[in-house]
Amino acid sequence: MVYVYINVLFIANFCSWGTTLLMGPGNWLILFFSALYAYLLPLDLQPRVSWTVVGVLAVLAILGEILESAAGAAGVTRLGGTRRGALYSIVGAFIGTFTGAMMGVPIPFIGSVVAAVFGGALGAFGGAYLGERERLHGDRFAIGKGAFWGRLLGTFGKLIVGAIMLALVTVDSIF
């Protein structure tokens, strides 16, 4: 019966990991479901998720957030952007992600995901561009481009951390 629970945990964590593409709290959901599993699974059932792994997952979730935030902010500030530009970039990424997810692109099965990721990056570009409105067009464009690449790299980094978390908890729950 424990292997049924392991499969449910894997499916919940995999779906949670996927929410990262939509600016969702995927890594935090992986941590939540894994901690809930470790807490609720009866002690006599083996194998189980250890609390040590749950602690490592917490550290990795924090690392993923820092990585995503730092990449996005660095994309704006590295090119001389202001805090307002960085804030507008975050808001633009949020709007772009959901607009992209709703509109999608005509790629079977993964069109909405691709559109959400690139919509978020384009939204970050637009937000940073609007946030630097007192600058010249060339500077605004460069800062927006930095926000675009920062958003893409931040999302990619957070996805990698989430994949490590998913692999870690899956291996620990099986062995």
Task: Give short role names for the model-derived ranges.
Residues 1-19, 85-95:
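Small-residue-enriched transmembrane helix starts and helix-helix packing motifs
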Residues 1-4, 38-54, 105-106, 171-175:
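Helix-coil boundary and interhelical linker segments in multi-pass alpha-helical membrane proteins
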Residues 11-21, 67-77, 130-134:
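C-terminal ends of transmembrane helices
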Residues 12-30, 95-112:
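Transmembrane alpha-helix interface/packing and boundary motifs in multi-pass membrane proteins
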Residues 29-46, 96-104, 118, 122, ...:
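Interfacial segments of multi-pass membrane proteins
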